[in-house]
């Protein structure tokens, strides 16, 4: 966190407010590997699995209780420039899918253009299969570990409430409103009916 304190509590659960940049301890720190400010860099430890859904394709679900505030998974893939993402995005749109995730934390904070995007099409982790929900149980945070460039955060997903075993893991894609191109199948009571 910017204040110099840990973004996590004693149980390793996020305590930083949404939108707060998270700076974890790294190779430049004198602390040990078990430092409580080294959560995302330890990797996946949440009890999750990939499964097939009826309407949304592949998805991810909890296999055991995930307590609120717990780190769940990092969105990984190939880091590309935004210009390359625009080119690839046209192809992906024509094919009816996209696994592009803009690394726009710095641009959102300082009003500049987003420089990089993660493409999880060919190189990816489990987070590629997280689906949208209008009432999500995960929220993404920008996390910096060894790379201090504000343009290159890591994207980490944390539970925003307790997640029951068998429950699908979701986040809000936050697509721009106005279009009516892809129906939403999240099933939430507050469903907006359309992704974009």
What is each PLM-predicted segment?
Residues 153-158, 168-176:
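Beta-strand-rich recognition/accessory modules
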